[in-house]
């Protein structure tokens, strides 16, 4: 346990310093103009200097230039778009695929209205919300893993 010395506010010398705005931040030094005019610009300029020095001294590797005439066989999106990409890839009708994607946020919006009867915060006492969460998480993981696989084994994940 740390022992900290608290200031003696009954000391008239300290009270006079505090009234003038003198002293350390712990004793009530005002943020204006000390912090805002002196400390913040130093931190901001230091951050800019560090960023610029890293960009100049250690630039990120760009890799080989892209060839617009040679595209890969299958273009994959970023990893966080895998479940959405898998929905579009599996559903045969594109309009139906877009409607399936739009159904996800609509379904998430309806969950609080379904659970409005239940006032408990414990997830074990909210079976509908817990079941929907587990089902949605499992479905998103399943679709995400399937999107990284070829189309013929994407639904079964190569298990069957």
UniProtKB/Swiss-Prot annotation:
Biological process annotations from GO: mitochondrial electron transport, ubiquinol to cytochrome c; photosynthetic electron transport chain
InterPro entries assigned to the protein according to its UniProt record, in alphabetical order: Cyt_b/b6_C, Cyt_b/b6_C_sf, Cyt_b6/f_cplx_suIV, Cytochrome_b_C_euk/bac
Alphabetized Pfam families for the sequence: Cytochrom_B_C (PF00032)
Chief location bin: plastid
Cell compartment(s), UniProt: Plastid, Chloroplast thylakoid membrane
Keywords: Chloroplast, Electron transport, Membrane, Photosynthesis, Plastid, Thylakoid, Transmembrane, Transmembrane helix, Transport
GO cellular component: chloroplast thylakoid membrane; mitochondrion
Membrane-spanning intervals of the chain: 36-56, 95-115, 131-151
Gene Ontology molecular function: any one: electron transporter, transferring electrons within the cyclic electron transport pathway of photosynthesis activity
Membrane topology: Multi-pass membrane protein
Subunit and partners: The 4 large subunits of the cytochrome b6-f complex are cytochrome b6, subunit IV (17 kDa polypeptide, petD), cytochrome f and the Rieske protein, while the 4 small subunits are petG, petL, petM and petN. The complex functions as a dimer.
Stated role: Component of the cytochrome b6-f complex, which mediates electron transfer between photosystem II (PSII) and photosystem I (PSI), cyclic electron flow around PSI, and state transitions.
Stated family: Belongs to the cytochrome b family. PetD subfamily.
Name recorded for this polypeptide: Cytochrome b6-f complex subunit 4
Source organism of the structure: Oltmannsiellopsis viridis
Phylogenetic classification of the source organism: Eukaryota, Viridiplantae, Chlorophyta, Ulvophyceae, Oltmannsiellopsidales
């Amino acid at each position: 346990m740390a022992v900290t010395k608290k200031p003696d506010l009954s000391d008239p010398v300290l009270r006079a310093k505090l009234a003038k705005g003198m002293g350390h931040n712990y004793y009530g030094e005002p943020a204006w103009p000390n912090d805002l005019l002196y400390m913040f610009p130093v931190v901001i300029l230091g951050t800019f200097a560090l960023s610029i020095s890293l960009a100049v001294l250690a630039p990120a590797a760009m890799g080989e230039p892209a060839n617009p005439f040679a595209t890969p066989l299958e273009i994959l999106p970023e990893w966080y778009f895998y479940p959405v990409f898998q929905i579009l890839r599996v559903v045969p009708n594109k309009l139906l695929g877009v409607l399936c994607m739009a159904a996800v946020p609509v379904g998430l919006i309806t969950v609080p209205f379904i659970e409005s009867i239940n006032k408990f915060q414990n997830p074990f006492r909210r079976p509908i919300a817990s079941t929907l969460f587990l089902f949605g998480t499992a479905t998103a993981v399943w679709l995400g893993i399937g999107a990284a696989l070829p189309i013929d084994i994407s639904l079964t994940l190569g298990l069957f």
